[in-house]
């Protein structure tokens, strides 16, 4: 990368956390109206599993355990000029309560069956669902991943 690269042209690293409880996924609707899993930017020095747990708790007040790697998506949001590499993690919810934790970012949360997801989905989550990820994964395979 050249030293004079424009910061907006450098991809960001995001982390999404697939939270599963009783076969349902915890999803959040952001202020722009798109649904996805809890997630956010990886902070300096932070590992993806810690980021996934932190973001999930900040956005939904849900604690996750057994956090493990699922996939990576390459997400280009041309309309807003952003490019993300999203690291997808999966974790199990502790407890059964969830609430909007960060109202500045999140409008609504809910538990959904993988076969009955709300719309519109955020591009990141859409890419994962479609298997446009590494390692390649068709359809809903990430939701079948269970901790060892």
Regions found by a protein language model. Give the residues of each.
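A structural signal for short, well-ordered beta-strand segments
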Residues: 15-17, 69, 89-91
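Nudix hydrolase/Nudix homology domain
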Residues: 30, 34-35, 103-148
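Conserved Nudix-box catalytic region and its N-terminal flanking loop in Nudix hydrolases
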Residues: 21-58
């Amino acid at each position: 990368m050249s030293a004079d690269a424009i910061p907006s042209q450098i991809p960001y690293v995001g982390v999404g956390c697939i939270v599963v409880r009783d076969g349902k996924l915890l999803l959040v609707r952001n202020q722009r109206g798109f649904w996805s899993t809890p997630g956010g930017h990886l902070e300096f020095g932070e590992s993806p599993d810690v980021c996934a747990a932190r973001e999930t708790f900040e956005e939904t007040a849900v604690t996750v355990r057994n956090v493990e790697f699922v996939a990576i998506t390459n997400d280009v949001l041309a309309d807003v000029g952003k490019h993300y590499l999203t690291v997808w993690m999966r974790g199990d919810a502790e407890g059964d309560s969830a609430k909007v934790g960060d109202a500045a970012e999140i409008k609504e949360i809910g538990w959904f069956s993988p076969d009955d997801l709300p719309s519109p989905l955020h591009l990141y989550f859409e890419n994962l669902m479609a298997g446009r990820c590494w390692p390649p994964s068709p359809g809903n395979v990430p939701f079948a991943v269970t901790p060892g």
